[in-house]
């Protein structure tokens, strides 16, 4: 899977078939993200998500058995909630990354514009995600990417604006 950031309303998530090292990738299909500037992909067994930087959204798609992408199932849009210190870079929500913990019990999304990480959990019908809580980090830090250690006990955040690596315990 790859994002296709054309800079128009046609920004998309594309599916490709891989048939071996000596064969070219075959494009299966592409589906509009409903969000601008998709920049990150996270996949579970039958769902795939894009983090869309411009406009601050996450798009959720269902996957077909053949690996193709079905029409966007849900777009979660986030708003600027406060006054971020960097008026140029933090004028709106900017989702950079969506990922999950070691067990895929929760997803996490990094928002550069709001200086926070959203914790997302399955909704009541288990057919999508909803925000469970929000962890705010230092104002002006600009969260970019989050990853977990191999055992899922610790999370590490890279910030874009302050250039830091932050560590968190995860239970």
Feature names for model-found ranges:
Residues 106-163:
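Loop-centered beta-sheet repeat module
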């Amino acid at each position: 899977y790859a994002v296709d950031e054309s800079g128009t309303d046609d920004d998309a998530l594309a599916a490709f078939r891989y048939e071996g090292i000596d064969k070219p990738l075959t494009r299966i299909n592409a589906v509009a993200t409903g969000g601008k500037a998709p920049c990150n992909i996270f996949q579970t067994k039958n769902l795939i998500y894009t983090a869309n930087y411009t406009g601050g959204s996450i798009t959720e798609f269902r996957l077909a058995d053949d690996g193709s992408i079905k029409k966007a199932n849900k777009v979660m849009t986030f708003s600027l909630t406060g006054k971020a210190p960097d008026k140029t870079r933090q004028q709106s929500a900017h989702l950079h990354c969506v990922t999950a913990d070691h067990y895929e019990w929760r997803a996490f999304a990094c928002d550069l514009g709001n200086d926070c990480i959203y914790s997302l959990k399955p909704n009541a019908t288990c057919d999508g995600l909803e925000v469970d809580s929000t962890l705010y980090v230092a104002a002006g830090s600009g969260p970019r990417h989050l990853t977990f250690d191999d055992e899922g006990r610790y999370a590490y955040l890279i910030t874009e604006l302050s250039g830091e690596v932050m560590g968190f315990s995860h239970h």
